[in-house]
Amino acid sequence: ALEVGPGARKQILHREEDPFLFFPLPRPNLIVASMWSITDFREDNGATLLVPGSHQWDKERVAKEKEIRSAEMPAGSVLYWLGGTLHGAGANSSSDWRYGIILTYSLGWLRQEENQFLDVPPEVAKKLPPQLAQLIGYKTYDSLGFSINPEYPLEQDS
């Protein structure tokens, strides 16, 4: 979960795809991000800021203030954007906390941002339904090869 507390400053605009420097900007879409609002997202409590179209920009291009949009939405809403889009949390000038959950979806051949092998060790993952274990990375992506067990790593004995 992400939180923006009273008095928080505006976050620096960034891209979810910034770690993937091997593709120059603009690049093919690698990630789709989603922000689920737990509380109302308002301009005064730090609603997510987005720069529409910035996924098509060169790295040197800087957003002008008039290009930045505040994603105001009621609790229970979801916002989707391409991973190359500039975004960040807005400043919170209110007395309210702003809460949200961000989930990102990447191409199957990219390494996940979170290391699920540390968060969910194999002995725990073996007890999960197979589809859930696969979704969190316990199945290698089809077609790239160079892996020990491309079918299902949990079937290996350690």
Describe each PLM feature range.
Residues 8-72, 110-120:
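Catalytic core of non-heme Fe(II) oxygenases with the double-stranded beta-helix
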